[in-house]
Each structure stands twice: as structure tokens, then as C-alpha cells.
């Protein structure tokens, strides 16, 4: 009985964490909204998108977990402290995420990513829209970076899970908060919202997922302080909802 409860708590923990963080972010949006939002017109659609995402993610994880990834580092590397391994993991994963995201904004691959850009308003749950191919490509970067955590302490994986949940919700939040100094290193809502803008100059800008350094190094950086006027979001074309969800 105890084992069953333990397994149940372990299975429910990510969902409880997701909604706990979501409620905090919703409170922040209510107190300091960047733009007025009609939550009722969006929330139920995004709840459905969340359900589809969870089902798709579970399937993708089951499949990709079977991919054999060799330990491609010298044996001496695995004696490094867990903190060092975790930092290296994030550098490799985030570098991969940047290039996968950049690939998704090319014509041949755009269809699998455009659902993510379809919300007309951005708020903490808006970033959950993702097709199955979208999830697969982003999950591959995690898998390729995973050998860096070989023999790492278990707490490192807890940190990654919590950070991944916070990150996606955080960067899409509808808040007025800004910090130019933080944006020198990390992606913020203000920074990422530019990427979701309908403006052609913004569409392939600020592609970073966690760190802003890749945008600065590879020519896709757009300074949030240079934005003139209000941003508008959504797609510049009408696409069938079915095609959006499937990614074709």
C-alpha cells in the first residue's frame, strides 16, 4: 500500500507543481498585467492543448527513452561535482534548443511550429501549444545532453524538472516586470514576447530558450528596449485548427 501511494505521489508531483507554479504566475499577471487579456476565450482552449501536450509528451518520452545514447566523455569527466555537470548540461541543452528553434523558423519545418505561435495573447499557459514533431525535436536536445549527467546526484534531475516547468510558463507570462541586467544572461517574458510578435523583423529574433548569449553570438538578438509601440501576437495567415494541431 505504501509503495502504491509513493508511486501515486511521484506521478502526481509534476502536475501539482505545474499548477502550483501556474497559480503564482496567474496572480502575478493579475497584479501587474502587461496587456489586457480575455482569459475566458483562451483558457479552455489551452487546457485542451495542455491535455494533448501531456499525452504527446508521454508517448514521445516512451519512444525516445529507448534511443541508446553512448557515454561520449572520458571517464575522468564523471568524477566532476554534480553542480559542474549540471551547468555543462544546461549549456549543451540550451545550445541545441537554440538551433532546433532556429530550424523551426525555416520554411520546410515551420508548419510543425506554427501552432505554438498561434495564440493572439501571451500569458503563462500560452506556450503549451506544441505538435508531436515539435515535442520530439525539442526532447532530442535533452537526450543528447543527458550523458553529461552520468552518475550525477538525483537532486540534479529534480532541479531540471522544476526549471523546465517554470521556464516555459515564465517566458510567456503577461507581466510588466522587466530587468535589462537579467536579460544579459537569461530569457525573460519581455525578451521572449518579441519573438512571438507578428512584426516581420521580430519573427526570427530572440530564439533563445534559457540563455540570451546564443542570440547575441549568432545574430538573432533584438534588444527589447528598441521595440516601438505595442506588440501584437498570433499568425499572419489563417490556418485550419486541425492542420495547426497536427503540424502540416
Where are each of the predicted segments found?
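Short, Lys/Arg-enriched N-terminal segments with co-localized hydrophobic residues
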Residues: 2-7
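Specific transmembrane helices
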Residues: 12-74, 78-98
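A transmembrane-helix-recognition feature enriched in membrane-embedded lipid enzymes
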Residues: 22-23, 30, 47, 209-220, ...
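Membrane-embedded catalytic scaffold of the fatty acid hydroxylase/desaturase
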Residues: 51-60, 80-232
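A membrane-cytosol interface segment of integral membrane proteins
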Residues: 229-248
